[in-house]
């Protein structure tokens, strides 16, 4: 991130104000203030690590993944108990994405569930949609299989197994 001295001064002052307003996180803000004031380029890069963008196509794809899980959960609830027994209910939980390699996707899912209030039935679990392993390729394979199902919101246990195993 390239900044003029004036921009660095403004940002430094912002971090100072934040450290005063939020004593619980004061140490973090003081560290960031020091990084900006001294111009440590390597550490400055970490200040904007959460900046980024997800294209409209990527956003729609993530929503499609979440909608697929919603459809599987609803389908499961409509199954008779004998058919439900054939489905591992734990696999119906939307795990999210890997924060280490798919941070933008994790943050988008958190935005959709927290800020937008979508998919309130999804269990955030302890990791709050951090699957701790890359999931994008897996979800894409699952989505392809789900889209090939004739009744996407009335899946049978066999179709769910095919989606899980994609």
UniProtKB/Swiss-Prot annotation:
Coiled coil: none annotated. SUPFAM superfamilies: YfbU-like. It holds the Pfam family YfbU. NCBIfam families: PRK05445.1. Belongs to the UPF0304 family. This is UPF0304 protein VSAL_I2183.
């Amino acid at each position: 991130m390239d900044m003029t001295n004036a921009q660095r001064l403004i940002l430094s002052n912002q971090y100072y104000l934040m450290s005063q307003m939020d004593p619980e996180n004061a140490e973090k803000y003081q560290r960031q203030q020091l990084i900006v004031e001294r111009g440590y380029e390597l550490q400055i890069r970490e200040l904007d690590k959460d900046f980024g963008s997800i294209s409209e196509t990527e956003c729609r794809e993530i929503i499609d993944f979440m909608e697929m899980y919603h459809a599987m959960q609803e389908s499961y609830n409509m199954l008779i108990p004998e058919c439900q027994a054939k489905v591992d209910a734990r696999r119906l939980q939307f795990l999210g994405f890997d924060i280490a390699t798919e941070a933008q996707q994790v943050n988008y899912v958190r935005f959709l569930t927290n800020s937008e209030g979508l998919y309130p039935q999804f269990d955030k679990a302890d990791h709050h949609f951090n699957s701790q392993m890359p999931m994008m390729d897996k979800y894409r394979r699952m989505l392809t299989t789900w889209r090939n199902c004739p009744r996407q919101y009335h899946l049978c246990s066999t179709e769910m197994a095919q989606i899980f195993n994609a």
